[in-house]
Regions:
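Helix-coil boundary and interhelical linker segments in multi-pass alpha-helical membrane proteins
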Residues: 34-36, 93-102, 185-198, 218-227, ...
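Alpha-helical membrane segments and immediately flanking helix-loop junctions
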Residues: 128-176, 196-221, 295
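Structural signature of multi-pass alpha-helical membrane transport proteins
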Residues: 2-74, 87-95, 241-297, 303-315, ...
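Small-residue-rich segments of transmembrane alpha-helices in multi-pass membrane proteins
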Residues: 22-27, 51-53, 76-88, 110, ...
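Cytoplasmic-side transmembrane-helix entry/capping segments in multi-pass membrane proteins
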Residues: 15-19, 68-82, 104-105, 129-140, ...
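Structural signature of hydrophobic alpha-helical transmembrane segments
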Residues: 39-55, 77, 99-113, 137-140, ...
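Entry/N-cap segments of selected transmembrane alpha helices
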Residues: 19-21, 74-76, 82, 87, ...
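Oxyanion-binding "anion nests"
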Residues: 217-258
Length: 350
């Protein structure tokens, strides 16, 4: 009798199959991400989850779609938002004091200028659609794939556009892992006053993903890795105000156009800030914080798997070369423009 009751449970019938599939993909990619060779490349579970999700989605998923789609959509939407909220347990306000005013200013200037350059090049030069440009801009400016995922509910982009943006920021963020260690001796030769700690701030303020920042900083020096991670987490903290500003822009546009289409207010972004503020009080034991961090990583990985499952190769091919070209141009700006911002701020404010 219990089995019959369980099988008729709406949650089991509607959502559980898709959630289990996303959970299976997340588990596999989490294990693969721990392989030393993969970890050195900075390929985290989020990146691997969308890759495996796309492979499964374009091969064996079709016969399962009818049974799994509701759970997959739940993972892509609700679990994503919850994962972003729990991401707040990764940061504290104390990290702002660790990098100082100059570090905060560098992150703000780099983020805003990078997003502006992305919009300028993407819309004016390459004539790409606004959703793709904004997603690539968010991923390049803030925290890679996680920022792309967090921006998607605000701009309501198609899964294929999200996948293209993720692929773009992952590609050039991975290249940065190999380029930045080579850049350090060159920068030190031309600018002898630049310290390993300052180069770490440059690394954290310009490389896309947290895992990529860790990998690049670790390849240079311990002090570089430490300052890079702090600068990067401060950059992650700017995700919430970025999403709120983006939502405000869309709301203003809609009011001017008298559109009936609703704009989603990113409540999860506010909750992200609340969680970060709460985490700054250090009321929870470290074990609990680690548990919430792990749960948030699992939820985001499941959301990425769901995104991959709903992305089709035909849609990726239709995107063409322009998103990759935009990613390359923005990466160039991050290195050169971001480097210039770092030098000027550290010269006159630090």
């Amino acid at each position: 009798m219990a089995d019959i009751t369980l099988s008729k449970n709406p949650f089991v019938q509607q959502w559980l199959p898709g959630l289990l599939l996303c959970g299976l993909i997340a588990s596999v990619t989490a294990a693969v991400a721990q392989v030393p060779g993969i970890a050195r490349l900075g390929l985290g579970s989020l990146t691997l989850a969308i890759m495996l999700g796309i492979i499964v989605g374009n091969s064996v998923y079709s016969p399962l779609a009818g049974q799994c789609d509701a759970g997959v959509q739940l993972a892509k939407q609700k679990l994503l938002r919850l994962g972003v909220i729990l991401f707040g347990f990764r940061i504290t306000l104390q990290q702002i004091t660790d990098v100082g005013l100059s570090g905060l200013l560098i992150d703000v200037l780099t983020l805003s200028s990078t997003f502006f350059v992305t919009c300028l090049l993407g819309r004016r030069l390459l004539k790409l659609d606004r959703e793709t440009v904004w997603l690539i801009g968010a991923g390049s400016s803030i925290c890679g794939a996680a920022a792309v995922l967090a921006t998607e509910p605000v701009v309501k982009a198609a899964p294929s556009k999200v996948a293209v943006a993720v692929a773009t920021v992952v590609l050039f963020g991975t290249l940065a892992i190999f380029i930045y260690p080579v850049l350090w001796p060159l920068v030190h030769d031309f600018f002898p006053r630049v310290t390993l700690t300052q180069f770490g701030i440059f690394t954290g303020s310009t490389i896309h993903e947290v895992a990529q920042v860790v990998a690049a900083g670790h390849s240079i020096a311990p002090e570089t890795e430490s300052s890079a991670v702090i600068a990067k987490m401060l950059r992650v903290m700017l995700l919430a105000p970025f999403l709120l500003l983006l939502s405000g822009v869309l709301r203003r546009e809609q009011a001017e156009q008298q559109s009936a289409k609703p704009v989603t207010f990113p409540w999860f972004a506010l909750m992200f800030v609340v969680v970060a503020l709460f985490n700054s009080l250090h009321w929870l034991p470290a074990g609990w914080v680690n548990m919430f961090n792990t749960l948030g990583e699992i939820l985001l990985t499941m959301a990425m798997a769901a995104l991959g499952l709903t992305t089709r190769f035909t849609a990726l091919r239709a995107a063409g070369y322009k998103p990759v070209l935009l990613g390359a141009l923005v990466f160039g700006w991050l290195v050169l423009g971001g480097g210039t911002i770092n030098l000027l701020v550290q010269r006159f404010i630090a």
